[in-house]
Amino acid sequence: MESLINPSHGGGNYDSHSSSLDSLKPSVLVIILILLMTLLISVSICFLLRCLNRCSHRSVLPLSSSSSVATVTSDSRRFSGHRVSPETERSSVLDSLPIFKFSSVTRRSSSMNSGDCAVCLSKFEPEDQLRLLPLCCHAFHADCIDIWLVSNQTCPLCRSPLFASESDLMKSLAVVGSNNGGGENSFRLEIGSISRRRQTPIPESVEQHRTYSIGSFDYIVDDVDSEISESNFNRGKQEDATTTTATATAVTTNPTSFEASLAADIGNDGSRSWLKDYVDRLSRGISSRAMSFRSSGRFFTGSSRRSEELTVMDLEANHAGEEISELFRWLSGV
């Protein structure tokens, strides 16, 4: 009975256990609070750094883009300022190249296939506008060759230059003068077709034709005669040019017939208009190159002897350009 009434024997252990729990609760709470605060502070710092980084990128990008645009604009203006004259001369020469429709070319051979463009590798349609390169007598789609000539100043097939040199012009005009009395009213025009290159030997009938390599294809020039009326010729963008009664025959024979046909075309009063303009522009280009070479030699040479030699060379180049113009006027009777 006394043990039940007086619980002093087991009550001491219970009191010690409860007191230890009470002493542990504040320390645990403090540790948990410290951890939570550390976590919150670290997360806040991360978000703050990310926001600052985004703001800095937003402020730097407009400045860099504006500076790069200003640099590119100034460079383009500087280079465009230096290239005004060549680009203008180049565009004027391109505009002087003749344009005609493929339907205006009549083929004398009934077994002849339709021609193909060597740039886009597609067939010529009757209503397609073709542009002719007079120095090599190759014809292409006007849009195709215009895009090609923006970055390449040569023929896509034979790689002959668009802007002829003094020697090329003198050679062509000299042969023109010797063959002017032939009376053959013809102008050579090379139009061919695309053929996939094979491993087998080329047949003899194809070997007789003129063949050009275009990657994995061969461009075979048709060995037939064609005829085109001069009234179907347009010069550059002048689609309403005055028509004439003369005709220009397109011949795809050997290369030596080009000069004879060119002589006949020059001798014809009606068909020499666009060719005269083309040669005049080339002559002006030769004279401008001679003047630029002369000015650079005068300002950047160190000795008087060197300047005298350059002056003689410049006079010879200018004289060659004048001879070309005079020879052309004499041949055409201007």
Swiss-Prot record:
Disulfides per UniProt:
none
Could you cite one Gene Ontology molecular function of this protein? ubiquitin-protein transferase activity
Q: Does the keyword Amino-acid biosynthesis apply?
A: no
Q: Where is this region: Disordered?
A: 1-20
Which keywords appear in this protein's UniProt record, sorted alphabetically? Membrane, Metal-binding, Transferase, Transmembrane, Transmembrane helix, Ubl conjugation pathway, Zinc, Zinc-finger
Q: Mind telling me which GO cellular component terms the entry cites?
A: membrane
Question: According to the UniProt entry, what is the EC number of this protein?
Answer: 2.3.2.27
Please tell me where this protein is predominantly located.
Answer: membrane
The yes or no answer to whether the keyword Zinc-finger is present is yes
Which SUPFAM superfamilies does this chain map to? RING/U-box
**How would you describe this protein's topology in the membrane?**
Single-pass membrane protein
The reaction(s) annotated as catalysed by this protein in its Swiss-Prot or TrEMBL entry are: S-ubiquitinyl-[E2 ubiquitin-conjugating enzyme]-L-cysteine + [acceptor protein]-L-lysine = [E2 ubiquitin-conjugating enzyme]-L-cysteine + N(6)-ubiquitinyl-[acceptor protein]-L-lysine
Which parts of the sequence are RING-type zinc fingers?
Answer: 117-159
One GO-annotated biological process of the protein: protein ubiquitination
Assigned protein family: Belongs to the RING-type zinc finger family. ATL subfamily.
In Swiss-Prot or TrEMBL terms, this protein is called E3 ubiquitin-protein ligase ATL4
